[in-house]
Amino acid sequence: MNSNYKLDIAYIAGLFDGEGNVSYKKYPKKRKGSKKDYMTWNIRLEISMTDKDVIELVHETLGCGTFHKKPPSKGQLGKKMQYRWRCGYRDALHVCKLFWPYATVKLHKIEQIIDHYEPDIQELGDNVVDLEKERFIRTQWP
């Protein structure tokens, strides 16, 4: 891993902490041919903004998720094109592990996603990992 990659991850993690959205919730969903609702997980990360270059950097650096544009609706004349990066489920786990050392505002939600997929990592009452040690290791430059 080169230092530019680490810098890009740190930048994107900070951007995500301020501008991103974490969806981690259960909701009822019907399966085909069934009358009964089943609880289904929705696990997703998203960043939306009008700066295309930044969203392209996010998509290229993280190497997962989708990049697409959302034009303003007809009633929003004069508004800018919005660009969006999204990832979900196992890709969200991968990204959460990258963002975790840098997260502050969304740390709890990021840890929930990591715990959802890797519950055996922690003991009861512990954090996902030793926060101080992991942040030190992940932020050291080669």
Where are these regions (language model features)?
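Internal intein/HINT superfamily modules and their associated LAGLIDADG
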Residues: 1-142
